[in-house]
UniProtKB/Swiss-Prot annotation:
It catalyses: adenosine(37) in tRNA + dimethylallyl diphosphate = N(6)-dimethylallyladenosine(37) in tRNA + diphosphate. Substrate binds at T14, A15, S16, G17, K18, T19. This is tRNA dimethylallyltransferase. The lineage of its organism: Bacteria, Pseudomonadati, Pseudomonadota, Gammaproteobacteria, Legionellales. The keyword tRNA processing applies. Keywords: ATP-binding, Magnesium, Nucleotide-binding, Transferase, tRNA processing. It comes from the Bacteria. The gene is miaA. One of its GO terms (molecular function) is ATP binding. It comes from Coxiella burnetii (strain RSA 331 / Henzerling II).
């Protein structure tokens, strides 16, 4: 019988309702929330990351939010160390860690450690090959440079095999190949992981929600938030914080590369692509219980499930 303590992981694509559900669960069960989000770690990235607001944070605190400046490239390895520290602190308080977010690589290294690069989806591989046949591998290399400049710098523009593999990693996981380079020393944590996946059954529901949420962000002064970052003078578009979906597109708008409508269109499209990559990874997740974002009795379903397995 497994005597290791529980960790509950609430995963899902962007805009699926994870934060609301997590706060509701933390008010009903002895949970303390740890954010598993590669963008929420940054101070000043609030509106565009859908970070919990002050009222929500007063109701239920979230660990690993607002812990570093956008000028600092926060890594998966640093997350592993920070998360382990927070998990131990919560254990001492006789509470259960509730890990919530959509950065799948972070969940992966906590639960499974890191031994090898993930395998690519055959559909993703075929798509890349078709694009290369149409535009050439040099063009694909240019695109790789935009999303993973470190890997692109190490790969010859004519090395089709390595370009394809680097692009497969990004398309499948949403993380650049270079982010995996320092992870081989990390081992899976000795806990019982309870994996909950929150996602809508209807893809159009998620697409509409993503569009509405981004438009609401714009109404909530998202442009001004990015402008403050832009005007600092010490940040640039190659930093992970500024490459975050939404921020990247508004940055290009502020620099004159996009007009307003193009910025909006590109941001919504990029967010939908992010959700698609997250779902691709989640469908392969072992031992996970799926819940439908659209269910009206979602909270009671999840609470009943957790109580049913002994929590």
């Amino acid at each position: 019988m497994n005597k290791n303590p529980f960790i509950v992981c609430l995963m899902g694509p962007t805009a699926s309702g994870k934060t609301d559900l997590a706060i509701a669960l933390a008010r009903k069960l002895p949970f303390e929330i740890i954010s598993v989000d590669s963008a929420m770690v940054y101070r000043g990235l609030d509106i565009g990351t859908a970070k919990p607001n002050e009222e929500e944070l007063q109701l239920t605190s979230h660990r690993l939010i607002n812990i570093c400046d956008p000028s600092f490239p926060y890594s998966a390895g640093q997350f592993y160390k920070d998360a382990l520290s927070e998990i131990k602190t919560i254990e001492i308080r006789n509470r259960t860690p509730l890990l919530v977010g959509g950065t799948m690589l972070y969940f992966h290294i906590l639960e499974q450690g890191f031994s090898d690069l993930p395998t690519a989806d055959e559909t993703v591989r075929k798509k890349i090959q078709e694009e290369a046949a149409q535009h050439g591998w040099a063009k694909i290399h240019e695109r790789l440079n935009a999303i993973d400049p470190k890997s692109a710098a190490r790969i010859n523009p004519n090395d089709a095999q390595r370009i394809q593999r680097a692009f497969e990693i990004y398309e499948t996981t949403g993380q650049p190949l270079s982010s995996y380079q320092s992870l081989k020393r990390f081992k899976a944590l000795p806990y019982q992981f309870i994996n909950l996946i929150l996602a809508p059954e209807n893809r159009s529901w998620l697409h509409q929600r993503i569009e509405k949420r981004f438009d609401q962000m714009l109404k909530n002064n998202f442009l001004e938030e990015v402008r403050q970052l832009y005007n600092r003078g010490d940040l640039n578009s190659d930093l992970p914080a500024i490459r975050t979906v939404g921020y990247r597109q508004v940055w290009k708008y502020l620099s004159g590369e996009y007009d307003y409508e193009m910025m909006r269109h590109k941001a919504i499209a990029a967010t939908r692509q992010l959700a698609k990559r997250q779902l691709t990874w989640l469908r392969r997740w072992p031992d996970a219980k799926w819940f439908n974002s659209e269910d009206k009795d979602l909270i009671s379903q999840v609470v009943d499930y957790l109580k049913g397995i002994g929590m």
